[in-house]
Structures are given as structure tokens and as C-alpha cells.
Amino acid sequence: MDSNNHLYDPNPTGSGLLRFRSAPSSVLAAFVDDDKIGFDSDRLLSRFVTSNGVNGDLGSPKFEDKSPVSLTNTSVSYAATLPPPPQLEPSSFLGLPPHYPRQSKGIMNSVGLDQFLGINNHHTKPVESNLLRQSSSPAGMFTNLSDQNGYGSMRNLMNYEEDEESPSNSNGLRRHCSLSSRPPSSLGMLSQIPEIAPETNFPYSHWNDPSSFIDNLSSLKREAEDDGKLFLGAQNGESGNRMQLLSHHLSLPKSSSTASDMVSVDKYLQLQDSVPCKIRAKRGCATHPRSIAERVRRTRISERMRKLQELVPNMDKQTNTSDMLDLAVDYIKDLQRQYKILNDNRANCKCMNKEKKSI
């Protein structure tokens, strides 16, 4: 009821509904002044009771013919103590859009009827749970709510009222149904605001993604170069050159920009080469220049050790490289000592034949 009173406020303060006052006032006045256009709650409730097959006095056609005189004194006294329903002024409907559903006196009186039925539960026969659910609102009343703008079409209730309406008022009722069931215009539609916006504003997905990082570097460098050119053109006062640079800045990248992209890619690859590897590569699979040089140095050492093994005896029996080198050093020193001894012996040697020739 609070929401209904808020909707039918005779003095609307919001400026959003003032734009709907452009509808003809005669049409709205005809809908307000016509008492037969409103919903009859007694007939509507009796139709739902009979359609659901409720047994007893409530489901019989005599339910409509019962007069308030046949009710008990307790129910009459309780109905007398109830506050009267609020009277709606015709001017309260002027601030509403033409497609918004109207509420008549019959629906406002349905509250008193529901309370009336709730008091007399001990005088009537027990009813099913469907009657309790439908006493508050019909089953399919909120099935045709529009998901785009939030306005309900209320087509089921309009169909019930159109079946019960007399031929004399059929024209006005059809106009009312057509206005209420018409899809809302573009002025009445509410803009949808997404609650969760997709997080797609990041320039790249991850810091370690090389492709996105290269694209980001190239775009930043291209923008910096273009901004520098624009600044130089503004200082020199060349208006035509500035316009051309501006069009180039807004257009697709040209050959110069692609060359700068290639330069940025080369710099990025060199940066990757200078950064040490986090994971150790297998032997023979490393591509770093230092790794390649180390591998070449080790291959040279192994080749020289093989040559030493061929020259130095008993060197192949050693398993340790340091022991092999010590053995080779000792062998070389021994050879040097032998060489020195032989030289000394040759110097001190005197041949007898030479002495005879000299005499």
C-alpha cells in the first residue's frame, strides 16, 4: 500500500513524469471519470475461486449474490471500524505515463474484502491454500513483467475485465487496454546500468606476456614520437604541417612507425638476453652467448687432455683431471732434467779422432 500511495501522489515532485503531460487531457479525464473501467474485485475474486475448483459456498455462483446484510454482526462491526480507503483525485493520474497501469476503486476495496474473509474463517468451510494465495494477488499477475524497463503490462487482468465488460463501454475499455498493454515508448524506458562492468581496461593480461608487452611499448613509443612532432610543429608555426601530422596521428601507422616497432622489438630481445635465466637450461641446449663460450672452452680443454694422454704414459689410468695434470707436469720436468744431462755430457765429451787430426 505504501508503494501504491507513492505512485498515486497527487503532487509529484520528480521531473521525470512531467514529460508525460503531453497526452490529451480529454483521454485521461475519460478514463478517470468512467467508473465502469475500474476492476470489480468481487467479480475478479469469484472468477479465480471458480477456476481453481474450490468447494463450498465460496466456489459457488451464489458468492456474488450474497449481500452484506447476511454477514455476522462481528464482521459488520469490524468492517465499520476499518478506515475508509483513500479517495483518489482525477488529477493524480495526470502525472503518470499512458502505458502505466491504473488502479480503480474495486482494487482498493479488495483489501477490505480480504480482511472481511479472514474474520469469517470460522463461519465458512475450510478452503484450499490456492485461495489464500490468490486472495492477495492473482497467480499470473507478475508473469508479464518487462525485463527491460521494469513496467508491468497487466495483460491478464485486462483480459478478465474485458470479458466482463458490457458492450456500451467496450470502446473505452479497449482503448484503455491498448494503452496499458502497449510497450513503453522510448521516453519511458529506463537506462540499464550494469552492476558489474567487465574489467577489460588493462593494456595487457599479465606482466610476463611478451607479445602484449611489446605492443604496449610500441604504442607508447609511437604516441611519444607523434606528440613530439606535433609540439615542434606548433613552435615553428607551420599550420599545414601541423594538420598533416594530426591526420597522421589519427590514422593507421605507416612505414616509419613499423620501423620503430621493429627497433623496439630488437631492444626488447636484447633486454631478454641481458636478463639471467630463472630456470637452468640443460647442457647443450643453452643459447646464451656466455653459455656458448663456456661450452667451447670445455670442449677445447677436453681435446687437449686427450693429446696429453697420448704423450704421457700411464695418464689414462687417472680419473681426476687435476691428477692427470700433475702427472703431466712431473713427466715434463723429468724430460727437462734428462735433456740437461745429455747436453752436459755432450759438452764434456772429447773425441780421439778429432785430436789426432789437429796434431
Swiss-Prot record:
Please give the name of this protein: Transcription factor bHLH130
Annotated region described as Disordered, given as residue ranges: 161-186
Q: Which UniProt keywords apply?
A: DNA-binding, Nucleus, Phosphoprotein, Transcription, Transcription regulation
Q: Which GO terms describe its cellular component?
A: cytoplasm; nucleus
Matches recorded under InterPro entries: bHLH95_bHLH, bHLH_dom, HLH_DNA-bd_sf, IND-like
Which PROSITE patterns does this entry report, sorted A to Z?
BHLH
List the lineage, top down.
Answer: Eukaryota, Viridiplantae, Streptophyta, Embryophyta, Tracheophyta
Composition bias of kind Polar residues appears in 167-184
- Single GO molecular-function term? protein dimerization activity
In its UniProt entry, the species of origin is given as: Arabidopsis thaliana
Among the GO biological process terms of this entry, one is: regulation of gene expression
Subunit structure and binding partners: Homodimer.
Return the Pfam families for the record. HLH
Gene encoding the protein: BHLH130
Where is this protein localized, as stated in its record?
Answer: Nucleus
Tell me which residues make up the bHLH domain: 285-335
Q: Where, per the database record, does this protein carry Phosphoserine?
A: S60
Query: Record's PANTHER family?
Result: TRANSCRIPTION FACTOR BHLH130 (PTHR16223:SF351), TRANSCRIPTION FACTOR BHLH83-RELATED (PTHR16223)
